[in-house]
Amino acid sequence: MQDIKTQEQETKLQKNRVPVDKIEKKTIVEKKPSMKKVQKEASTGDVQKEATIKKERRACTHLKRLVKVAAFLLIFALTFSKLSEVLAFKNASYEANNYYSFDYLYDLPKNSLDVVYVGTSQYHMGITPLEIWKEYGITGGSFNVAQCRAWMAYYMIQEVLKYQNPKVIVLDAAVPRGGDNNILASRRAINQFRCSLTKFQALYNCLELEGSTIDEMINKSFEFFAYHDSWDTLEMADFTDDISSLEYQKGYLLTTKCMPYSDMAHSIDQKPTRFMLDEKTVDYMGRIKALCDEKGVDLIIAKLPSDMWNITYSGMVGRWAKENEVEFLDLTQKQFQRQMHFDNETCYFDENHLNHVGAEIASNYLGNYLTEHYQFESHSQEIEDTWKIDYEAYEAYRDFRILQSTQDLSEFIELANNPNYIICLSIRDDATKGLADSECESLQSLGLNMRFVDRFRTSLAAVIDGGSVVVQKDGNFALSCEYEPYANCEIQVTSAGYSAGNKSSIVINGKEYSKNKRGLNIVVYDKTKDEVISSRIFDTWLMQDER
């Protein structure tokens, strides 16, 4: 009975048992996703991919816009700067005021200056850093503003010391003496500062902006806004003059005009107009001294020769210097001028400024003084090479300027006798009666046959190329010669003494360059530039003291 029951239970279990192969199939077979789900997932992936592409496109668009904005701002800044320079006030009566440059500071290698000179137009025209470097190896830069006052000098020094670590700062004595605040000149200099807190402080304090409205501040602070109404007064020179072309001279402006000391009105020039340092000047001079002490820089105050300086000014500045333990060099004193071999008759541009002759003498004295009192470190070869290149450019510019202005025939010949130059000579009327022996020697140094000197009112047509005479014709008749040194350069020289036609002509490439006046007409042609660089007349019919 029990066996029958057990058998029934097993039969029942077998009916409920699932075959093994079916269990395995059910376990192994995965459920395939529906078509809707596949389409949905594919659609989601496409959306994400499209969103990524759109995001990248937007980023690229934003980047392009950013580049365009940056380019626009850069172009605007450059245009604004150039227009500001074009519109800036130009001094028609005193050209030197138009060529102050401050921003050459940012092109100098950092900490490459041994000495920094800061001052007025007197330093601008009276100190030539490249001559000091050539003679003494001292690197220096001159940073100047017309009628520079102590507050302007303070901010210039502050800006310079961000980029240079000089051993000495030489400050113009006219700065502490004080005077009227030249806002036009100060603005022009400050606008060359790099954008910084110093620049805005300088604008505010040097341009007297306290109490001004925002519009007034903008109009006073920037050349463009200050002179935006002056379009109708612009001349070609406003667009063509480029002060940056002289930046290699390190803040120096070479001038060749000469005012003899005997022509000056000394009693008027030397009359004092100030008798004590004003409160604002004392304040900023104190700041200058404190800044120099903080940076470990020695401060020297120096006055260059000037007929507009007097014992009152010297006493004012000297007392401040003594109280603040600052060295004061007054080169207006006769004892210093004797040491310098300073010639009052040849060294002045006007009553208050030196010409190139005086500048070289004063610079030599300063260089010697600095060498005797300071030990300067040697410079890297890179800096030495750079200064050598700048000096050579300065020397060429110097010779060119003197060649155009000198009244000394011997000096002119010395400068014109250059391998790169062609010298053309033509006599009209007579050029021999007043010739000095030294002038004859100079002409002979060119290789000329001097037989013409013994002939009164003789004709002379000659061409010297690179120091060699290529053609010379002289006699009592009208004479002419031609010379073609190379293709597209044709020279014709004609000379007729007083009795032979009384004429001078020097034609180069079809253009007349002779002054056609009595005496020795000379034209100098620069082969490297393919242009005439000087056309002069020396009336050597007159004696030297009569010219």
Spell out what each predicted region is.
Residues 315-385:
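C-terminal regions of proteins
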Residues 55-74:
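N-terminal Sec-pathway targeting helices
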Residues 1-44:
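N-terminal targeting leaders characterized by basic, low-complexity, disordered sequences
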Residues 399-422, 426-547:
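Short acidic-hydrophobic catalytic motif
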